C-alpha cells in the first residue's frame, strides 16, 4: 500500500519528457493507466541511470537497491510516451539532474566554448583580421591612394594669378568647356573672358594680357562724373574795398536788419525774442489769463479814468493840465 501511495504522489508532481528528446543521460517519468503487466511495475515511478555506459539499466526509487536489467528498449518507451499526456513546457524536477548536452536549436551555455567559425552573413569578430580587399562599390580607405581621373580643371577665381602652363594648355577644347561651363564668354579680341562663379552666383572677368581677374567689367564705360569746381568766389565792398563774407547779402540793408543792428547796442534783443518764441506781444496778451485780483484792479482803474474825464468837463482848472479840453469847457 505504501508503494501505491508513493506512486500516486509522484504521478501528480512528475512531468513527462517526449521520447524524441530522450538521450543516454535523460530520465523519464510516466503517468500512464495502461493495464499491461509488463509496465505495471514502472508506472508512476522515477528512475535514475546506473553507470555511464549502461543505456537500458534503471533503478526504481521504491524498489530495493539491487539492480536489474530492463528488457525494455527505446521502442517500448516511445510507445508508452505516445499514450501518455505530455505537458506543453517540460521542466526538470528537483531530483532530476540538468542534462550535460544542450537540447538541439538552443543557444550554448556560458561555460561552453564559442564556435570558432562564424555563421554565414555575420560580421567578423574583433580578433579576426579585416579583409584587405574592399568590397566592390565602396570608397577607398584613407591610406589608399585616390584613383586618378580626368577631373575638370576649374577656371581661376578672382584675385588669383594664372600660371603660364595652364594658360598655354589647350587640352580642354572649347566644346568641352562649353559643356562643363556654358557660361564662359570671350570678348571680340579674345582678351577678356567672363566666367561664371557658381559659389558667388556672379561673373568675374579674366584679363589674359595682364593675367589678372576682377569682379568689375573692364569693357563697360566708366561713368563720366562732372569735374569738381575748385574756383572760389570772393566779394569786396565797392566803397571800402573790404572782404565781404557770403552772409553779407543785400538783405542786410533792410529796415528790419538796420533796427536790429542799432538796438543791439542798448538792449539784449536776442534774449527778449527767445523769451516769447518770436511771438508778438498782442498774441501773448490774448493767451494770458488774469487772476481775480488783477481783474478787480483793472475795473477800478477804468472807473477812476471815467470819473476824471467827467469832472474835467466842468472844471476850468483842468485846462492848465490838458489844454485840448478848453473847447469842451467853453461850449
Curated annotation (Swiss-Prot):
Residues 1-184, 290-309 are annotated as: Disordered. The keyword Zinc does not apply. It comes from the Eukaryota. GO terms for biological process: mRNA cis splicing, via spliceosome. Residues 9-22, 57-89, 158-184 have a biased composition (Polar residues). Keywords: Nucleus. Its main location: nucleus. Residues 105-145 have a biased composition (Pro residues). This is WW domain-containing protein C2F3.14c. It comes from Schizosaccharomyces pombe (strain 972 / ATCC 24843). The lineage of its organism: Eukaryota, Fungi, Dikarya, Ascomycota, Taphrinomycotina.
Amino acid at each position: 500500500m505504501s508503494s501505491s501511495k508513493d506512486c500516486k504522489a509522484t504521478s501528480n508532481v512528475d512531468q513527462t519528457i517526449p521520447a524524441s528528446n530522450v538521450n543516454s543521460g535523460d530520465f523519464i517519468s510516466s503517468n500512464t493507466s495502461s493495464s499491461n503487466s509488463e509496465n505495471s511495475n514502472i508506472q508512476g515511478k522515477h528512475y535514475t541511470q546506473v553507470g555511464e555506459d549502461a543505456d537500458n539499466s534503471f533503478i526504481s526509487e521504491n524498489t530495493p537497491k539491487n539492480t536489474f536489467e530492463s528488457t525494455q528498449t527505446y521502442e517500448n518507451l516511445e510507445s508508452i510516451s505516445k499514450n501518455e499526456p505530455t505537458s506543453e513546457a517540460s521542466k526538470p524536477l528537483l531530483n532530476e539532474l540538468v542534462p550535460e548536452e544542450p537540447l538541439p536549436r538552443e543557444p550554448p551555455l556560458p561555460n561552453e566554448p564559442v564556435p570558432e567559425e562564424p555563421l554565414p552573413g555575420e560580421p567578423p569578430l574583433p580578433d579576426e583580421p579585416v579583409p584587405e580587399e574592399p568590397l566592390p562599390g565602396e570608397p577607398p580607405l584613407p591610406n589608399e591612394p585616390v584613383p586618378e581621373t580626368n577631373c575638370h580643371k576649374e577656371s581661376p577665381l578672382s584675385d588669383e594669378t594664372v600660371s603660364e602652363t595652364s594658360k598655354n594648355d589647350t587640352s580642354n577644347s572649347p566644346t568641352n568647356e562649353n559643356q562643363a561651363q556654358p557660361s564662359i564668354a570671350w570678348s571680340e579680341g579674345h582678351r577678356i573672358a567672363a566666367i561664371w562663379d557658381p559659389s558667388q552666383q556672379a561673373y568675374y572677368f579674366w584679363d589674359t594680357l595682364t593675367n589678372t581677374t576682377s569682379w568689375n567689367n573692364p569693357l563697360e564705360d566708366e561713368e563720366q562724373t562732372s569735374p569738381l569746381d575748385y574756383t572760389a568766389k570772393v566779394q569786396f565792398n565797392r566803397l571800402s574795398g573790404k572782404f565781404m563774407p557770403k552772409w553779407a547779402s543785400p538783405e542786410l540793408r533792410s529796415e528790419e536788419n538796420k533796427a536790429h543792428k542799432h538796438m543791439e547796442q542798448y538792449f539784449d534783443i536776442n534774449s527778449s525774442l527767445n523769451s516769447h518764441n518770436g511771438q508778438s506781444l498782442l498774441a501773448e496778451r490774448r493767451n494770458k489769463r488774469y487772476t481775480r485780483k488783477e481783474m478787480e484792479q483793472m475795473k477800478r482803474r477804468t472807473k477812476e479814468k471815467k470819473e476824471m474825464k467827467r469832472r474835467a468837463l466842468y472844471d476850468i482848472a483842468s485846462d492848465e493840465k490838458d489844454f485840448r479840453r478848453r473847447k469842451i469847457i467853453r461850449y
